[in-house]
């Protein structure tokens, strides 16, 4: 639907069209033209595109929407986008309706169990990530020995892991959770192969996610890569 969508989807989609996310009017016109009344959002559009100056300028409808916002936090922007769709008779559904099967239940997901130190860091990191999410800033925290190494903001999960992992000098624990007031229609927390690759690069040792509320994309590849690199993953 928007820039960044994998091209492979063309092969499995009944209809495929790439539209720059800044072109809100075009997105709505396309959906209405196809008589779409229900949508489910998949993936994430980073706010970085609003500030980089390297992307297509927003259309009149997007400018009007952005100008009406009290702030540009994730929830404020996404709720406004959902409301704009609703004005046109388009309902946005809960992402978990289709993706519940890739949200793991509580437990250790990898072959290696966490150490006592990692367990303590996972509990600490989980709490810190929840607090960060409560401020609607990010969903990821990197910790070591109950000290916060990095908090996710606009840079995204992978950059946060790289920054925090380097500061930790190895054996960091990454926590990724849903916000306390998470709206399941958009921006559900997700981890994937790139998450593990980032952890490998900085020699992070553990990942804790929120059970039943975090998506694992390409689960088999994620767990295999984690096992190969002695990374422990826990759904808490």
Model-predicted regions and their roles:
Residues 1, 41-43, 143-144, 176:
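Short beta-strand segments
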Residues 44-46, 147, 179-180, 213:
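Active-site-proximal loop/turn and secondary-structure-junction residues that shape catalytic pockets
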Residues 2-34, 53-66, 158-236:
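Feature captures the catalytic cores and cofactor-binding loops of soluble hydro-lyases/lyases
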Residues 21, 71-75, 91-196:
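Conserved mixed alpha/beta catalytic, RNA-binding, or beta-rich assembly cores of soluble enzyme
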Residues 3-8, 83-93, 97-109, 231-234:
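Catalytic domains of riboflavin
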Residues 24-98:
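N-terminal glycine-rich phosphate/adenylate-binding segment common to multiple enzyme folds
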Residues 5-7, 47-49, 99, 149, ...:
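Short, active-site-adjacent cap segments at secondary-structure transitions
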């Amino acid at each position: 639907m928007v820039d960044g969508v994998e091209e492979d989807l063309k092969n499995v989609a009944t209809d495929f069209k790439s539209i720059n996310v800044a072109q809100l009017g075009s997105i709505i016109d396309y959906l209405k033209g196809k008589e779409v009344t229900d949508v489910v959002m998949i993936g994430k559009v980073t706010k970085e595109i609003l500030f980089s100056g390297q992307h297509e300028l927003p259309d009149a409808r997007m400018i009007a929407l952005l100008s009406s916002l009290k702030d540009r936090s994730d929830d404020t922007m996404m709720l406004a986008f959902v409301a704009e769709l609703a004005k046109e008779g388009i309902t946005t559904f809960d992402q978990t309706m289709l993706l519940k099967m890739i949200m793991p239940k509580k437990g250790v997901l990898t072959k290696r169990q966490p150490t006592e130190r990692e367990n303590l860091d996972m509990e600490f990191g989980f709490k810190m990530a929840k607090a960060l999410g409560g401020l609607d800033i990010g969903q990821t925290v990197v910790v070591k020995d109950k000290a916060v190494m990095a908090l996710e903001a606009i840079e995204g999960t992978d950059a946060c892991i790289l920054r925090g992992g380097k500061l930790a000098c190895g054996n960091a624990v990454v926590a990724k959770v849903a916000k306390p007031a998470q709206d399941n229609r958009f921006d559900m927390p997700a981890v994937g192969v790139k998450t593990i690759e980032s952890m490998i690069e900085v020699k992070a040792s553990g990942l804790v996610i929120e059970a039943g509320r975090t998506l694992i994309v390409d689960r088999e590849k994620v767990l295999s890569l984690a096992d190969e690199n002695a990374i422990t993953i826990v759904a808490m």
